[in-house]
């Protein structure tokens, strides 16, 4: 039998009153006796401190403070220590007879908080002869000793051979060692466990029924069913992990898409930018070289343009100088033409106006005569009309007023008298005494005839007067003409001068006729002279362009030479054109071939990438399409073999899973029907009874029971008979054994044990021989061992199955990849490398470009020579026809001679133009100048006489006319008679009035007609006079203007002036055209020079910028390449197919990827920041950093339990292979892991039943415990009603609540909590989560209610409460409960600790005087029966009969306080024996 460990002694070093005191502890009861303040509590406090060195729990209060929530300020420890190093050590010996010293080093910490520093330690391997006080003290002399500090103690112990010293930094480690060595009964894993242990010690220390323990008896007494709970937790953890893995797979599936998307977009984003920079670097290098070539070419062009500009500027200056002279000449010629045209127009006007004046003169004279006659007739008509009017008026007046009529008659009488007077005057004037009124009319005609005759005679004289006056005017006119031509002279000299002028006029007219021929001759000579000058200018220009002076005789030979050169150059240019066309054609063919290859290159590169990937995946090299198809056949064969092997491993794994599931059944039943039958029969499975059998005993019991190892143990077989009738749902062989499940043993068989076998005598005539199984399955330990081995095998099989599944799917994916490759790339994959051919073609293209450039330069020089030769030939073609002009030296003299003759002729023409009209007028009347007419005065007198005679005749005719007109008045002779009373006067007046009115009307009409005619004649005359005066004045103005012009206007003057002007205009236009051409060419040349200068500057700037950019980009590119190579991403980024895309396409690709990446990394702050930094176009290396960050991020997110690679791209490929396999496997695993609600109910019920049985066993040990009136103590265990209902529903009505247990969103614990809430809606769950509640419901202890009951006197069984018991009864009852707890802890920990160790049992009791002698004896008996040590403190009047007693007396010696200790052991019936070391020397300060 295993001996129980014991505490041997307690050692106090430097405590208050104890300098170095060791208390040897009794195997049962150690009593500390002494008065108040003797040190009993200090001793117990030292023991507790060494046992539980946790300052958060230690609180040593006095007994009077029991129940108080606060004690002394230092919690009772600081004041119990002395200054300096203190120790409290427990010397123990365990079941293995190992001596172990555990203890603590204590030291007061200075300060107001009164803290204590505690360091736990342990000493193993210490010899039994060494006392604890000798370890920690050093003797200085006979009366002085020194306490060793902990480091010196360590050094001292390390010097001792075989002694181990351990210092602990953790209380958990300290207690773990104590548990493993059997010093304490329970493993204290946490602060909660330490608290329970301390409350237990504290309750025993102060005595009584501790409410802290009784309220949580389940935690103290009922062991945590760690196996069941761990099984549930493992199941839930496995399910949770399984679901989390499934969720992780779903997340990984989404991650796979995210990875694909992120890697794809990141690769597109960075690779596009990477390749764009690579392309741009190459483009920049090409541009830099191109800029350098263009710079050299532009400099050459600028030098040529500058030379050209100087030549054109010199020629333009010459043309500008000539243009001024030509403009002046042209302006003079234009002015002269205008003057000639003006003079001709004036001359025409003068001639026209002279003709008009002559005509107007004639018409004016005729009109004057007509007007004079009309005036005379008008006067006669007016007189006649007036007389008729007067007569009418008189007659009207007479008729109106008779008196007036009388006056009229008187007037008429007067008129009659006047008429008579007129008749007498006519007689006197006409010298006609016989003239009467009646004969007056006849005489009137006679005298009118005389008047007409006199008028005709006067007109004849007037005509003669006019003719004389005309002759006089012709002489005057001729004289005035001579004066106008020659100037003033005497009248008698006019004849001679006129003849001289006429002769001179003839000569001048002859000269004037020569003007036109001379002018034509001069124009011809001047034209030849100008052509000569133009030829000289062309020759000078030609010589200047040729850079050499040529003689006239050399020009024809030079012309032939230039034509020959043109022919040769034309052939060269033609041949060069053909050669250039051939080179261009070859270049275009190369370019077309390069374009086709560039279009084919991405396809070929994609095929090569796919081929390389296939080669990497399969580790083979393929050189032809046949190799690919052959390997594909091998791949199919390998796939079939892998599938067969995978299916075999899967079948074995399923078999192992089924065996594990069968062995994992609760109670060891391999058939679920046995559990139902056991519950139905009220029995227990035999495997449950032997569930705790050890692994070593499992083969024996398995062989012992043989086939009946799965029997059901029932209390009474007779009661089972009725249940067996009609039983079908059971195994083929059902074994039933009668026996008590609580005290079942193997006595039912007669057994003989052999070597690794047993012989079981079932009956007298039936034996059974059974060998020990190699793999026993009887008992939980055996099953767990088998399950563990099966799990190991399953892990191997699972790993192998996963490997094979992975290989199969990998092979399938490889087969798919080969199929895709064959379908997409096989046709082009094994063709020649287009990029190598492109490089060759590019080198050839460069050579062609260089040849074309050289050819263009040569052709340009030949073209320049050809153009120069053509210009020379063109110039010679213009010069050669004018060689005779160049050789004519007298042309200028002839021009001057003709110009002088032309000037003379033009003077004569101007004389003729100026005086030609006067000479023409003078010539017909020049003869009148010979004599001056003298009879003009006599003619004037005759004309005056005729005029007098005509007037006299007119007077006589007028007088006769008056008589004739007053002929009516002679009829008024009877007016006297009318006044005397003639009665018919009125009638006569009326008749005369009518006659007078008729006469008046005729006179008015005649007067009106003659007045209109006269007005018309006067108007015509006024118009003629006005026209004549106007034209005369205009004629005079025109003549003056013509004289002012000073140009002779002949018929050829205008034509000559126009020809001259046109010639000058043509010359000026040609000069201006050439000047404009030169100016435009010069402007264009200057613009070209400016453009070339700007282009040169820009090219220089661009070249240097590009060169600097190339240099800078080279450094940045080197950094990028270094970063790419260091991180191993060059293969991912250097995608050669992107090199054939344009920069815009790559930028667009990068921008699109950037937009997608912004959305993809929106939730990742790190990647978002790195992406934002990578957007800087000036820092391309940041994009590489982003790509590396993406790879690192994806590597971190790769689930290593699913994917075993660091490469995200390979991870994606493996994901697609693994995910479907893992999904299927985990789904089946979840179905296997899930436990039914009925199984949970059965497990909890079985556990409750087992613990109830255990509590009954504990109660049996307490049946004989009595304290005072308490006769017995027991624990009552009941199942809570709400939890019992939950178990019933789980086992019987679980189908109604499958919505909870089949939900993938709820764990089993959460589903259990939901069911509990559904069954008990009245219970408030508070703030606890369903998971917490479910975990509590999986703990069987929460299903039980426990309470302590005592059998006290006549009250019977009642609940143990301090108020219902006396103090001693309460102390005894509490001690009994504590003993039960300790025993329960030991049973609970037996599986955790070694089988050969039985832990120490020790309790305390302070102030034991409250117990009577019978109760103390009961405690002693309890300690003896339970092998428990007890330390009690009691006053001096307590004297136990057994155990060891220490009598403590506190004394003061020389101001030093110490405790005097005397120890006694078993004073009755043995003699007292003084224990060693009972006297203690006074403590001295060291």
Curated annotation (Swiss-Prot):
ATP binds at residues 34-41. Residues 326-418, 444-480, 509-603, 835-923, 977-1115, 1209-1266 form a coiled coil. GO terms for biological process: cell division; chromosome condensation; chromosome segregation; DNA replication. Keywords: ATP-binding, Cell cycle, Cell division, Chromosome partition, Coiled coil, Cytoplasm, DNA condensation, DNA-binding, Nucleotide-binding. One of its GO terms (cellular component) is nucleoid. Signal peptide: none annotated. Its main location: cytoplasm. Homodimerization via its hinge domain. Binds to DNA via its C-terminal region. Interacts, and probably forms a ternary complex, with MukE and MukF via its C-terminal region. The complex formation is stimulated by calcium or magnesium. Interacts with tubulin-related protein FtsZ. This is Chromosome partition protein MukB. It comes from Escherichia coli O17:K52:H18 (strain UMN026 / ExPEC).
